Amino acid sequence: MKNQLNEITSKLVFAIALGCLSQTVKAEPFHWNAFDLKVSPKNVGPLLALLDETFAAPDKPFKVTLSETIFSDNDVTHGLTVSSADVDAISALMSDEFKDGREQFMANLYQLAEVKSKYTGVRTFTTNIPEKGSDAKKAGSYFGHWEIEIKAADAPQFIESFKNVVSATKDLRTNHILGMGMFQFGKGKSTHYILHSFNSYSDLKKGLEAYSQKEAMAVHFKTIKEIATPVGSQVFKIIKQW
């Protein structure tokens, strides 16, 4: 893995760990570090160019994803995430060995974007796992993302109810990803998240309507109403994944 990381370093500057199929729920966890960004329209192109040049190596032990925020209750315009099933890959990115390159990358990033927040977590469950892994995301796809607060003692009950929903709604998903994960640091009251992929904006709107017609959803919401508190939601569109 060290040789792979050294190869990436030589491209421009070293990549930073920023801040970091079946129709049944599967455990193929991966770790991720994320930045919420505010990028002016004139800097979107240069940001893409920076990421293209930095993360061009094809055999990285991690993925880097840039997304555009479509709907949210804040002024974040883009999201940047580094993810890997191998936590050591992300750890290596953050090590002193690559300190100089990491700081140079950050300096370049700060010239193009305002960093609104940094946080880290782990995806614990994913359905319809893509061929390239649980963290693979297709350019142009939309994702609905819901943040919730759950007390640790109530998490098993929530997860069990979530699994029931997945089983009861599998007919609504063909190539769609439905996942659940945990925030570990940097997200305030939010402890868990649910996300769902959609092929287009129309697919998103029609998909949400289809879910609302399922009895399993009503049962789920009744089950979790005393143990899960909604914190926020957003829709984002994948620009590119390296």
Q: What name fits each language-model region?
A:
Residues K26-A218, T223-W242:
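Short S/T/G/P-rich N-terminal loop/turn motif that feeds into the first structured element of a domain
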